[in-house]
């Protein structure tokens, strides 16, 4: 036993013959320790999404050696890097354990709470993380305590049984540079490779149409590192700047006729959806009654479904798609061409409003890049009216009152484009009690009390939202100024950890079917006009507007108004005729069915459209 301890610790004065055995022990134990850390990360990944069988997912990792290696390699490389840098194995353990397990835990809770994996782009929102998760309940499970045990045990093991380190600085420098070189080459050659990512498909136990399930099927560290490619502008496949410029220049911006200039107000409603679209609730009298104001408003409007890229979070994807027409885009860090800039070029005043902080999603900067001249946030307007915390529960009446007053004040100076993002009904929703009306009870619905509380609290919030929107239409109708109003939901609401509330409703979210896709991604929209606008535009603004991606909503608005619009919008009309949905998962809508395949000619046009879109986003200087 003493000889074994001497091999592990190699105290000064030990038999020189033990040095080689100690080196072998150190190499094996450090590598094994790194593999254990990586393995703990994989266990977090496998158990993150409650919809999946965690044991089956773990088994799939073991049967896919490339996925296994790509998830273990960073932990092993980091533990060796720390050892060479600091000459202590415990330092290597910390350098490996903290980032690898930290990323895995954040991903675990993010999926548990929002069905949304951790991506590299989320790092830009690190300062906002507290605001995002503040209302959620983090369940401290046995896995959390097991992680604490592993951390303490691993640290003690490396301190007392692996204390020795290299004293020769040349060997340490060589080892450090070797680790860095390995990590750099692996990152650029393996972790950012789309080809390798596709070739590591692990679809046996998942639905390949689900982003979160595909992410989980590849572990955590590997898909997280792969997502770094999304942090940098990447042109679409086959992109040629000259061809993109030529395609876009085939169209010219068309002015809005002076006699047809009407003010436009858009409001994106937080987590708004029509629960009566779900079969179980569509037959429930109390739920149908709650949505009567919305259904009556729909009868007076052009209506349809917005097919979003997101679920229960990621609000700005729908928001910015509407404002820009981009089906996909990079983060906005400079003035970027958008429909807001077009309105400005037509003499419109452009105004943005949100009863929350301007730093959230960096809206205060992004909105300026997209062309808004005036912005109202908590910081500069709403703080005196409602706190951001209270705004989650009760702010829509305040919002629409401010919007109506602002419009009345500003229209004297010319037509307005006003866009607002609501905050009321932001999830999660209280699970332990119902705050007001009990639309659903375990007796009349067959749901658990927790699910009843979730849906009741959501319904009470949206009922107030609908009341506010009806009030707004009445105010706009009374105005002499012609106004067109666009209302739409950004994404489906949170429905319990692991989507428990949806599961009890029998909603499977089977994304391989069109019905399941709609259940997961669709939200309603409507385009309403006051009498003055109907007269000016010669349109009654009633009927079916169709179902389409968020990027085509502004196009439909222009169609209803009889406006040609900017050059890019004219191109987008052609794209919409081929497929009204260009989804973030490379899915399309053809003849009313979701598909991942287009005819060759249509696919070629899609690539040309994406190229023109990329050119517009990155090369066109708005206002020039």
Which residue ranges define each predicted feature?
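Serine-centered coil/turn micro-motif
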Residues: 4-7, 203, 219, 337-338, ...
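Membrane-interface micro-motifs in multi-pass membrane enzymes
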Residues: 114, 120-123, 136, 209-221, ...
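Short alpha-helical interface patches
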Residues: 114, 122-134, 143-146, 222-233, ...
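Hydrophobic N-terminal alpha-helices or hydrophobic patches in metabolic proteins across all domains
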Residues: 44-52, 58, 62-66, 70-72, ...
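Transmembrane and membrane-interface helices of multi-pass
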Residues: 2-211
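Solvent-exposed soluble domains appended to multi-pass membrane proteins
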Residues: 249-259, 266-269, 274-624
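Membrane-interface segments at or immediately adjacent to transmembrane helices
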Residues: 189-266
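Alpha-helix initiation and N-capping motif
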Residues: 123-126, 218-225, 244, 291, ...
């Amino acid at each position: 036993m003493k000889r074994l301890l001497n091999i592990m610790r190699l105290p000064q004065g030990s038999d020189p013959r033990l040095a080689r055995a100690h080196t072998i022990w150190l190499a094996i134990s450090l590598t094994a320790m790194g593999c254990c850390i990586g393995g703990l990360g994989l266990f977090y990944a496998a158990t993150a999404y409650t919809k999946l069988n965690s044991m089956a997912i773990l088994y799939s990792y073991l049967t896919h050696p490339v996925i296994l290696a790509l998830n273990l390699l960073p932990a092993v490389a980091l533990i060796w890097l720390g050892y060479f840098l600091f000459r202590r194995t415990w330092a290597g353990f910390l350098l490996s354990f903290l980032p690898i397990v930290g990323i895995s835990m954040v991903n675990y809770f993010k999926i548990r709470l929002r069905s949304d994996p951790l991506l590299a782009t989320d790092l830009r929102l690190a300062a906002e993380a507290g605001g995002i998760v503040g209302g959620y309940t983090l369940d401290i499970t046995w896995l959390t305590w097991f992680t604490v045990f592993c951390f303490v045990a691993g640290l003690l093991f490396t301190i007392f049984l692996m204390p020795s380190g290299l004293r020769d600085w040349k060997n340490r420098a060589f080892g450090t540079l070797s680790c860095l070189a390995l990590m750099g080459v692996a990152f650029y050659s393996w972790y950012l490779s789309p080809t390798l990512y596709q070739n590591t498909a692990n679809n046996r136990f998942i639905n390949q149409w689900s982003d979160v399930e595909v992410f989980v099927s590849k572990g955590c560290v590997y898909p997280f590192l792969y997502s770094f490619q999304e942090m940098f502008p990447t042109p679409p496949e086959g992109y040629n700047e000259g061809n993109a410029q030529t395609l876009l220049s085939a169209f010219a911006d068309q002015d809005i006729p002076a006699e047809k200039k009407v003010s436009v107000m858009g409001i994106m409603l937080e987590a708004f959806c029509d629960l009566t679209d779900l079969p179980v609730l569509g037959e429930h009298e109390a739920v149908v009654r709650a949505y009567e104001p919305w259904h009556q408003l729909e009868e007076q409007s052009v209506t349809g479904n917005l097919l979003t890229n997101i679920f229960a979070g990621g609000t700005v994807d729908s928001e910015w798609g509407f404002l820009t027409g981009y089906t996909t885009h990079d983060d906005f860090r400079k003035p970027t061409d958008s429909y807001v800039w077009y309105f400005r070029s037509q003499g419109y005043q452009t105004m943005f409003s949100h009863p929350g902080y301007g730093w959230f999603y960096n809206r205060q900067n992004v909105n300026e890049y997209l062309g808004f001249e005036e912005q109202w946030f908590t910081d500069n307007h709403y703080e005196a009216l409602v706190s951001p915390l209270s705004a989650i529960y009760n702010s829509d009446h305040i919002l629409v009152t401010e919007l109506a007053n602002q419009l009345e004040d500003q229209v004297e100076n010319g037509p307005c484009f006003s866009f607002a993002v609501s905050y009321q009904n932001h999830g999660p929703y209280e699970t332990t009690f119902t705050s007001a009306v009990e639309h659903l009870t375990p007796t009349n619905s067959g749901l658990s009390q927790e699910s009843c509380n979730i849906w009741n609290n959501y319904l009470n919030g949206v009922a107030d939202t609908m009341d506010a929107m009806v009030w707004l239409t009445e105010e706009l109708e009374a105005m002499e100024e012609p106004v067109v109003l666009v209302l739409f939901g950004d994404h489906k609401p949170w429905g319990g950890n692991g989507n428990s509330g949806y599961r009890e409703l029998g909603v499977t979210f089977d994304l391989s079917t069109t019905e399941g896709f709609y259940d997961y991604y669709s939200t309603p929209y409507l385009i309403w006009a006051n009498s003055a606008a109907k007269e000016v535009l010669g349109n009654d603004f009633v009927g079916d507007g169709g179902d389409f991606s968020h990027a085509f909503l502004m196009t439909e608005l222009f169609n209803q108004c009889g406006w040609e619009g900017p050059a890019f919008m004219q191109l987008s009309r052609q794209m919409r005729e081929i497929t009204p949905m260009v989804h973030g998962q490379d899915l399309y809508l053809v003849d009313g069915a979701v598909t991942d395949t287009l005819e060759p000619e249509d696919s070629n046009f899609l690539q040309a459209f994406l190229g023109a879109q990329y050119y517009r986003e990155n090369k066109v200087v708005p206002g020039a």
